[in-house]
């Protein structure tokens, strides 16, 4: 989803939705790796039924990772993908279904975003290669050290698009992987696996949602199925809420900013290519055996609990005294719809609504304020009530001017703070900073850019003396740098990037000044704001987009041909008269074919993935569609600071012209290219232990050519139709490995078959409601009336999936072990450094502690085992105090008491002294009530009621 900061905003506003995954790691014994047994209970105290993998979120980080060296070839990429899936599977451990969905041909509305992203990737890749070569030449010219440049072909991530050879090979590798795991992994024993590869049209996450919607509409569906969806896109959260399933969880890799990345030139960490100085790499390990080790740890996974998010939203959206019945499911649908205004993959966000400015909170407040005017909800099962939406947008339009002014004030304030911070840091810098080879360096800073550490100080000093002796005479007026070398009299010209103030991008619109609407339409659309007809056309297209996106989320693709034909969005104040705008879409549209989509989204630099005659249309000056593939294009920052936040001003592809040009080159396709250009479907896999195994085998034995209904009683209520697969995996047939480093499967028992979801009429409406029989999970958030209804009980927060999860507990043997290995003096409690009491209780009187008596009192019989290794409590907490008995005068033996305390002090310090021989800080709370102090002339007071040891 086109909201990069959405997940960060969501996790900060609703923190309890996040749960850290408990992951069991594989073990290694005698050099043999022992995988995790996924058939055992889930260590996260929850059992998932279905696991859905949005595979593109796995393919990209495995093929071109940012925080580690990339795989050397395609085979290593496939193995990395297999290992990533294994890791996810061992965390989630699904019991019924594993659904793998790879992005297929996308709707036309998404192709514009894909086109922009791929053109940007190609442009940035070429610019990075040019910059890398320039820095390399500069470093080598200065005598720097760089490893020899590897002659290898740069991996073009644009090949991760339907129709390429890479995606076709990936589908074959995943078929082999599924067969291998179903044959050999006990955790996959009774699992149903569905693979929807790139030949099946649709985005991966929407293919998953379409499967869930169609299964929910079946009478045999279990309404309490626990779903787990893997993916990092923000729209997965919206899609999960749109299912109205009570048990829906998202697993994603935890994002950790500022991860170390290796330099593209020297492969060292700590600097980028532009800062590389060509310094030799420091040896890691005695024999450089740790050269390939990475400083970054393996990424961790987190769970996002949508049932907890539903609790948050129910509290936030609940309204009293409504003119209609409150329905939390409908209000959540409205919340999902309002999130579309701050951005998505199909529409640009409104200029006045930024996620970083709490735009969603603003929309929710307006939504609750005008609900009495609207008289109902904004949406119903994916269909929009435009009359009510108009009231919301006009209310936003009334505050647009103040939003723009506040945004400008906040930006100016931020720049002032940054400028003052730079001045303060510059002022606090020391006047002289030592540098050079002999300068002391902090531990661990040898890998920092620019650091030079002398391995032989004596030799380095000798070389410096010889260099000074051989240098020409220097005038007295010559200035020196910190390392002793003369600096030019004229000084060094300061670089542009060293300036105190960074140049701000030119903004011709100036939304914070009067006349902002006229300037916006003139600069962005090249029309006058007074052109009411054009403005209404832009608004109508945007309203159509809102209806299309909501229908896409709740009902499926309404039209494969529709798209938003502008680069920018209108203002909220322009949403007048939208209630009468049509929101119907052309029916019966078909998706592009894979190679046709490649022609629509690829730049000319990625034409090597296309057939030669098709590729020529991208680069031939005489091509009828050459204008679709500009070599360079402008990026409008649109008020932003960084290029990646800007808008790529690419021409839109005319579908009619594209198809007309491709008709001439279609005959040039080979049979293999024709196969890759065809649309496919899903494939279902089961092992020999699955109840469906024998049923599918019988279909192959009978050779049935007609689709057959899936028996739901054999596969947990899954319904659809089976048809025979021409490339099926069958028992007793060898499954050849497409990856040379992996072995063939000679004893296969897995069977595969084509699978098709249940089909419905084109005008069928999937109801956005919670199904009958669905049980909501137990509430996780603290009840708002807990203080009134708890009768003084303390609230116990739920940290994981199970509220009754047993806490970690050690038995008495473990406490004895801890008490044995931990010295008494190393305790950290308030009594750890306290001296023994000066008196001990004998009979009913306090007596002096004689030298021959034991220094440690006897432990109480009812002491908890976990307290035994912490040392005994003070004596006055152990003994019963009798108020009716007097105390002996302490004066006769006060001298003995002082002598005894004086004798104890050296022993205590000798026992607790640190490495330097100095005693630690005493923390015996001397002088407070209940704690002894030297020279006290009265008996200790009775114990207070705050201590209870029973």
UniProtKB/Swiss-Prot annotation:
Residues 920-937 have a biased composition (Basic and acidic residues). Residues 445-458 have a biased composition (Polar residues). Gene3D superfamilies: 1.25.40.1050, 3.40.50.12390. Its EC number is 3.1.13.-. The modification Omega-N-methylarginine is found at residues 824, 847, 851, 883, 895, 946. Residues 468-482 have a biased composition (Low complexity). Keywords: Acetylation, DNA-binding, Exonuclease, Hydrolase, Metal-binding, Methylation, mRNA processing, Nuclease, Nucleus, Phosphoprotein, Transcription, Transcription regulation, Transcription termination, Zinc, Zinc-finger. The modification Phosphoserine is found at residues 448, 471, 473, 475, 482, 487, 499, 501, 678. Residues 416-426 have a biased composition (Basic residues). It is found in: Nucleus, Nucleolus. It is an enzyme of class 3 (hydrolase). GO terms for biological process: hippocampus development; mRNA processing; neuron differentiation; nuclear-transcribed mRNA catabolic process; retina development in camera-type eye; RNA catabolic process; RNA metabolic process; RNA processing. Its main location: nucleus. The modification Asymmetric dimethylarginine is found at residues 824, 847, 851, 880, 883, 946. Possesses 5'->3' exoribonuclease activity. May promote the termination of transcription by RNA polymerase II. During transcription termination, cleavage at the polyadenylation site liberates a 5' fragment which is subsequently processed to form the mature mRNA and a 3' fragment which remains attached to the elongating polymerase. The processive degradation of this 3' fragment by this protein may promote termination of transcription. Binds to RNA polymerase II (RNAp II) transcription termination R-loops formed by G-rich pause sites. Interacts with POLR2A and SMN1/SMN2. Interacts with CDKN2AIP and NKRF. Interacts with CDKN2AIPNL; the interaction is direct. Interacts with TRIM71 (via NHL repeats) in an RNA-dependent manner. Interacts with DHX34; the interaction is RNA-independent. This is 5'-3' exoribonuclease 2. The gene is XRN2.
